[in-house]
Design a protein with these regions (language model features):
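Short loop/turn segments that connect beta-strands within beta-propeller blades
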Residues: 225-228, 271-274, 332-335, 406-408, ...
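Electrostatic cytochrome c docking/interface patches
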Residues: 39-71, 142, 149
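Surface-exposed loop and turn segments in beta-propeller and other repeat-based domains
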Residues: 194-195, 282-285, 341-363, 412-440, ...
Length: 659
């Protein structure tokens, strides 16, 4: 049975809110300079236990009372609560949909381990882990299938492949977009799709071959007809697909292929015309490894950034923290074979002592690679950013920009931009011995570094960080910081997230500047600067800043005006999805808002499921063939849930021909 999202997400309905990493206190937020609440009135909170991270309000009640608990402890916890390679930690299992988990233990990778369990026991275990009812496990995705010409793909035009996977600058020319600045005023919703039984929609859509390719929370990857929203094919991945879908040509025949990753660190290659699996591999056997950044494609190869949620697992004081190291792996696009692997931390973590609780400490660890790498084929260069260390002592590879050779993965240079940053979720709790002595501040390089041409044959690497700073580095050495500007206050959820954009020598910077850091601290609302800024990449001059006022209103405790999603630039405009669920398009020269749309307005999708957006985070707008496509809904990290894929086109153009 497909869950009815009109009941799940409609007005007055019960909404699931998963608060991973940041706690689950449902308090009113002061999130802009216009907020009413003062610092003195705020009541910041820390996490009291790991259970608070997964406080659901919805399908099932008291988790401890569910019949699946003793079954899980007896049959599953021995691997999934321990540091067992290839066994995803419970942290990840709780993020999956019940359908995906049930499929895994009945016909997937865990089939043999669960063979002795009855069907009822399997259902109880799945519902205990996810706190969601399974429904009909045999029901396929609720879709309207394409017929006739709507099911036909056009030729893959590599010249119009833009954004993550191909160009981290996220600039789309008017020619590639299929509409220009003069038509933005006429953008209107053309069709929508409601992802069934979903509280988040965070896979970067890709427009190509007359289709929209996108992943989803339940692991289904869709190929939609761009014109009508009917579905050409679907593919069931092993877990949620939050990366973008990268298109490329495979083999000497140039077969169009779709590449992507799921949240338990599987990489897939599909025939883009049929959805059939070509190959599958896993770039990391660590139990907490994940793929959050979109793989990049160049020279027939795929470059996969690898991150993890061991930062969450470490909140258990009995967990020996930590052993994961972030890295980028190059694989052959034809068969998935490994070409090279470049670790942010070159050496395997070693034991460095014990915590106050007597638990082993392993270090250095962490430095996850959250976002898509930047590639310059002509310079034989790949650049990526890293996050914080997970354990003490911190090393020089966390919060860093790293450059390697594209052909071998050999390190060329590394520039740490914030030193001594070791942090994990234990630091959000009182007296948790697994918190590193550095205690943060968790200032990741959370956005893809941009390689920007500044004229006269020169280029700079522009990097943005969660402390709110943006700066330019020499691309050849990583040294000689050419300029630096601070655009936000910075915090665990502050500063620059996911993706900046660049149009020529202008860099557009999204800022998420939440007052409630969800780390036991409130920041002064009078100093908040959530929104978008434009910066001259040559000089660092701030050309304009639009600070977004809080329009959330009462009754929306997880609403915020900041920009946590990647933004997209096109000729004359820059497009940003905000955490308040509103898409805003800014004039490139002035920063004036020239168009907006509230994605939280419920609409009926092409599959008959109500599509209602929420906080927009992670992925950004995709432009192509006369359309703009965006996902909305991010029921994680104290942001608003949603399940909407929304497709817009200029109404004056009528039916737009898809390339």
């Amino acid at each position: 049975m497909i869950f009815d999202m009109s009941n799940r997400l409609g007005a007055g309905a019960v909404v699931f809110t998963l608060a991973v990493l940041i706690g689950c206190q449902a308090k009113a937020e002061a999130t802009s300079a216009a907020a009413d609440i003062s610092v003195e009135e705020a009541e910041p909170a820390t996490l009291g236990s790991m259970d608070e991270q997964y406080a659901w309000v919805g399908d099932l009640g008291d988790r401890d009372a569910l019949p699946g608990k003793p079954l899980y402890i007896e049959h599953c916890a021995g691997c999934h609560e321990a540091q067992v390679y290839k066994a995803p930690h419970t942290t990840w299992l709780e993020l999956m949909s019940p359908q995906v988990l049930y499929r895994s233990i009945t016909e997937g990778i865990m089939q043999s381990q669960a063979a002795h369990l009855s069907g009822g026991d399997k259902q109880h275990i799945v519902e205990y882990i996810t706190q969601m009812r399974l429904g009909d496990p045999d029901a396929g995705p609720a879709v309207a299938w394409c017929e006739g010409s709507a099911s036909e793909f056009s030729t893959l035009d590599e010249n119009h492949l833009t954004g993550w996977g191909h160009d981290t600058r996220r600039y789309v020319s008017s020619d590639a977009a299929g509409f220009d600045r003069s038509q933005i005023d006429n953008l209107e919703l053309k069709w929508s799709f409601g992802f069934p039984a979903s509280t988040r929609a965070r896979s970067q859509p890709t427009i190509a071959m007359g289709a929209v390719f996108v992943g989803s929370q339940d692991g289904t990857v869709y190929a939609f007809d761009l014109e009508t929203g009917c579905v050409r094919w679907t593919f069931a991945a092993r877990a949620e697909v939050r990366t973008g879908i990268t298109l490329g040509k495979r083999g000497p025949e140039g077969i169009p292929t779709a590449y992507f990753g799921d949240i338990i660190a599987n990489v897939y290659a599909l025939d883009a015309k049929t959805g059939e699996l070509v190959w599958h591999t896993s770039p990391d056997d660590h139990h907490s490894a994940t793929l959050t950044g979109t793989p990049a494609f160049a020279n027939g190869n795929l470059y996969v950034p690898v991150s993890s949620l061991e930062v969450v697992t470490a909140a258990n004081p009995e967990y020996a923290c930590c052993t994961f190291r972030g890295h980028v792996m190059a694989v052959n696009g034809d068969d998935g074979s490994v070409l090279w692997d470049s670790y942010a931390i070159p050496n395997t973590p070693i034991s460095t002592g014990d915590t106050a609780a007597g638990t082993k400490i392993f270090a250095p660890s962490g430095a996850p690679v959250w976002t898509s790498p930047t590639i310059d084929v002509d310079r034989n260069l790949l650049i990526f950013g890293t996050g914080e260390n997970y354990s003490s002592p911190a090393d020089q590879n966390s919060d860093a920009v790293i450059a390697v050779r594209l052909d071998t993965g050999e390190r060329l240079w590394s520039r740490q931009t914030f030193p001594d940053d070791a942090w994990n979720v234990a630091c959000m709790m009182v007296d948790n011995p697994n918190c590193p002595e550095e205690d943060g501040p968790d200032y990741d390089q959370a956005s893809s570094p941009l390689l920007v041409d500044i004229g006269a044959g020169k280029s700079v690497v522009v990097a943005g960080q969660k402390d709110g700073r943006v700066f330019a580095l020499d691309w050849e050495t990583g040294q000689n910081k050419l300029w630096e500007v601070k655009l936000g206050r910075g915090s665990i959820q502050g500063g620059v997230h996911f993706g900046m954009a660049a149009d020529g020598t202008t860099v557009y910077v999204p800022i998420n500047d939440m007052n409630d850091t969800r780390n036991g601290e409130w920041l002064d609302p009078e100093t908040a600067r959530p929104g978008v800024s434009a910066v001259n990449a040559v000089t660092g001059e701030v050309l304009w800043t639009h600070v977004q006022e809080n329009v959330c209103g009462e009754g929306r405790p997880f609403c915020d005006p900041g920009v946590s999603a990647a933004i997209t630039a096109t000729d004359g405009a820059v497009i940003a999805g905000h955490l308040d669920g509103i898409i805003r398009i800014y004039d490139r020269n002035s920063g004036e808002i020239i168009w907006s749309y509230n994605t939280t307005t419920p609409v009926t999708g092409t599959n008959g499921v109500i599509a209602r957006g929420g906080g927009i985070s992670g992925s950004g707008p995709a432009l192509g063939a006369g359309h703009m496509v965006i996902n909305s809904g991010y029921g994680l990290y104290n942001h608003e849930a949603g399940n909407a894929l929304l497709v817009f086109a200029p109404k004056a153009t009528g039916s737009v021909s898809a390339r």
